[in-house]
Amino acid sequence: MRVPRSQPWGLALLLLLLPGTLRAAESHRSLLYHFTAVSNPASGTPAFSLSGWLGPQQYLSYNNLRAQAEPYGAWVWESQVSWYWEKETTDLRDKEKLFLEALKVFGDRDSYTLQGLLGCELGPDNVSVPMAKYALNGEEFMEFDPKLGIWDGDWPEARTIGIKWMKHPEAVNKEKTFLLYSCPHRLLGHLERGRGNLEWKEPPSMRLKARPGNPGFSVLTCSAFSFYPPELQLRFLRNGLAAGSGEGDVVPNGDGSFYAWSSLTVKSGDEHQYRCWVQHVGPAQPLTVELESPAKSSVPVIGISIGFLLLMTVAAGGALLWRRRKGLPAPWIAFRGDDIGALLPTPGLSKDAES
């Protein structure tokens, strides 16, 4: 049994096919689902997870720990029919079972990662091109042919998995229907209802701070918060002249926006000669931020926070007194039956899809 060894760097194979490499990515005319199943997940991490993409923009997330399909980023505001996310959740739970069943073919002696990329893109003539590719431990593994209705690949294990999956007639029919009909229909619906999300531009808020570094030096850190799209240029200026871009990164926030930072080591005493310059499609002009004064940044925030807490306390007390005078129960005991679930907020909101 020749199975590729797990190579973390190789798991980017299918990620390279995510929006950004397809022609459709530029105009958001692709809808792709990226599935990942792992045989031996670390404690507290999902064995199965999925992200849904409209062009270069993620709009959906799912994992077996929460077991609910949820809109991602700005797509929580997309107007959808009430059953849409329920259907998406049901379909993804079925897909989760198939992926985890497939991993059992390899046994439990080693770790395996099975990935799938399913979806479609629309060409200039609105003709849909389906995609259904799978990778094992970062190597191309098998494909699904929607016309023949079969999963197949060069590996013996791929054929074994294909036979297992084809024992579920509903799985074959759902895969064919999704790739040939549901996917392009759903894509067009998202393009129509979510046009504002696809054109979403959120300018960054900026901060430049200094902290002690090695003796005789300070470290300047320029941060850009909550911006979209992720493309952003950041550099340091010294007395108005370019002084390098420093070292940093751009990472997702988890709500669809991004966070970026860059650090530069400078001589102690020279900190106030530096500015941070940022260019992004959100603001009309590039942003320049000066070094933040610790005294200025902390006192107002603390004062505002304390004032806000006092205001909320007074308001809550007044509301409770009013309810008691009216003979009404306190708000935290007004929940009944199904409402009990609302007592604990969930990390994400729920709203749009179908698979």
Curated annotation (Swiss-Prot):
GO molecular function: beta-2-microglobulin binding
Extracellular side, ranges: 25-300
Tree of life domain: Eukaryota
Cytoplasmic side: 322-355
Protein name: IgG receptor FcRn large subunit p51
Start and end residues of each stretch annotated as Alpha-1: 25-111
Region annotation Alpha-3: where it falls in the sequence: 202-291
Family stated for the protein in its record: Belongs to the immunoglobulin superfamily.
GO biological process: immune response
Membrane-related topology note: Single-pass type I membrane protein
Transmembrane segments: 301-321
Function: Cell surface receptor that transfers passive humoral immunity from the mother to the newborn. Binds to the Fc region of monomeric immunoglobulin gamma and mediates its selective uptake from milk. IgG in the milk is bound at the apical surface of the intestinal epithelium. The resultant FcRn-IgG complexes are transcytosed across the intestinal epithelium and IgG is released from FcRn into blood or tissue fluids. Throughout life, contributes to effective humoral immunity by recycling IgG and extending its half-life in the circulation.
Signal peptide (UniProt feature, chain positions): 1-24
Protein's organism: Camelus dromedarius
PROSITE patterns for the chain: IG_LIKE (PS50835), IG_MHC (PS00290)
Residue ranges of domain Ig-like C1-type in the record: 203-292
Keyword Transmembrane tagged: yes
Disulphides: 222-276
Keyword terms, alphabetized: Cell membrane, Disulfide bond, Endosome, Glycoprotein, Immunoglobulin domain, Membrane, Receptor, Signal, Transmembrane, Transmembrane helix
